[in-house]
Amino acid sequence: KPELGPQQLQMVMSSTGRNCLALGTAADANINTAADLRGKRLPWVIGSPALQTNVTAFLAYGGLTWDDVTKVEVGGFDEAWKAILNNQADAMTSFTSGGGTELDASPRGLHWLSTPHSETENWERMQAVAPHMAKRIATFGTNLSADNPLECGGFPYPILVTSPDRESDLVMNMAKGITEQFDSFVSAEPAAGGWATERQNFQWVLPYHAGAVAFWKSEGLWSDADEAHNQNLLNRQAVIAAAWEGLE
């Protein structure tokens, strides 16, 4: 077996911005709900499991699979959006802050598909495909603002991770240093606000390092529910690591 198996990475903190990963649709395709994707033309980016999974997750949200849509094979992310512009496809995933501007200015127009947080069963189907997707409200991106928000999902980026054997004091002071210096760098670029303490997600897909937990507890932000979630993730990592060691 390969020498490098599952790595027990642990979180320190992360940045959750005001954008989200959404499905951008051509406005003239009249896709108002995920169920409306049935029969539409969706890009399949050859050789990119990550991009394929993103689109698959939105199909799952609507209770659909690739059998319910027309698959349009494309060579990359940019080609997927060009296919929409050229009326060869109808929708593609993107961060709201980094895509959609050209489509919005085109005759087809842009419509971001909302994934309402109250639709619990839909979210369960989406997260079964893409467990890293977490609920959020986007106010940053093409056609989005505080007055025109989008109920959607996304994941923290960038994330600050470390190994379990890193000294707790070092990890704690790293989180403390970033938090204390937040006001000094928050205006450096639009996404920097995602490092704010109130934008941390303590129940994501990676467990937090003991030093980070100590810091967030000292800030009064770490709950019993966070602790239970963290222990489950740590146990999961231990099981996966043990299973790897047992492989021949």
Language-model features: where?
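Extracytoplasmic
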Residues: 6-7, 18-20, 39, 107-110, ...
